[in-house]
Amino acid sequence: MLTDKLIINLKYKKILKQRRGNMLEIVKTEGKSLNDYIDIIGKEEIESIRKLALSLKGKKVVHINATSFGGGVAEILSALVPLMKDVGIEVEWQVIKASDDFFNVTKAIHNGLQGMDVPFTKEMKEVFLKNNQLNEKLFEGEYDFVVIHDPQPVAILNYRQEKKGKWIWRFHIDPTSAQEKIWKFIKQFIEKHDAAIFTLKEYVKDDLKLKNIAIIPPAIDPLSPKNMDLKQEEIKNIVTKYKVDPDRPIITQVSRFDPWKDPLGVIDMYRMVKREVKDVQLVLIASMANDDPEGWEYYEKTARHAGEDYDIHLLSNLNGVGNLEVNAFQRASDVIIQKSLREGFGLVITEALWKGKPVVAANVGGIPLQVDNRRTGFLVGDISECAERVIHLLKDSEIAHKMGTSGKEYVRKNFLITRLLKDYLNLFNSL
């Protein structure tokens, strides 16, 4: 009988043999022009960004992450990478290759870094390190800047015999309640980098020994299919296609099926709202990403919790809901919910605010950075307060509209992809 350790070793030798000589997966992105954003941010800001990029012209940059689809990181890179190209930087986006075991381990690491009590065994560490070692072998080329996104590829640099260029680690989640054993394991690899990027200064752990730390919140692309303007007729057609009535109140949460996003709590909140607003509908939209093996299990749990209430709609990319459809549902909604228990930032909140929608969201992590309480939405604690605020907004359309208008302007000033591009250019120049 084979031991677990031997099975792991045989499995990874097989993967390495199959992939030796290959490269990391290169993600192709559609071209973008910075000039297309003139009407949104103004000519002066466009010129400022181009001037900032002059000293970086011809520099080679690569972004490395775990998936090309699903989740906020992939969405950000699909806009950021082509805009970096447009200002004269030679930039690539590459995705690591790994086994299902690896993604199960990194999901546990992700949960542990957000405070969940998860096992973290010697075998799990071995799976993590073997995959990072494999990806170091697949990583080819020389770059002036290498940007590593999140924990999955953080140890690639550990196996690099000769470090060339500046290596930057970008952390997208909230580690303030991280399990100590998991944080210590990851920290040793973070500290090999030249710089690290966090969403909030509160996310920077006191024991992190790294000279260069940048605070850069994420951002959205206002011209992407997920955020661009849509005609009312198109919105109506998309929503009705999924058997949601656009003429009745709609509350929506867009997030993965994940315990941290608390879809079960959202359903409980909706049931409280329905006692007051009888015709309300709930839409839960998720993208099922290939680095999220826990997603299916939690989808089934959510479906069981929803029961046979035909006013609860569980939608995902697997039944044809893509970026355009998410856009339409956000625009058709009366209130957007984000009832996360932990949230590094929550791009879907910024997306909703950009569409002029009031947001009711949990007062956790990076959410208060976006939701200015009582001005662009409501920050809430428990399910009862969440339901109370949703009912308030459904019954007072004037307040809802006022919050939505304020929210859009707040995003224009703080959370557009052009600001994120500028932040990266400043960081590269500083290194």
Model regions: which residues?
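Conserved donor-binding/catalytic core segment of Leloir-type glycosyltransferases
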Residues: 62, 239-261, 267, 282-283
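Short acidic/histidine- and often glycine-rich active-site loop of Leloir-type glycosyltransferases
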Residues: 207, 364-374, 378-380
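Nucleotide-activated donor-binding/catalytic signature segment of Leloir-type glycosyltransferases, i.e.
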Residues: 286, 290-328
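Aromatic "clamp/platform" in nucleotide-sugar-dependent glycosyltransferases that forms part
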Residues: 341
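Short glycine/serine-rich donor-binding loops of glycosyltransferases
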Residues: 346-349, 367
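Short hydrophobic beta-strand element within catalytic cores of glycosyltransferases
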Residues: 349, 358-361, 371
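Conserved acidic donor-binding segment of nucleotide-sugar-dependent glycosyltransferases
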Residues: 373-384, 392-397
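A short, well-ordered alpha-helix in the C-terminal region of glycosyltransferases
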Residues: 392, 399-413, 420-426
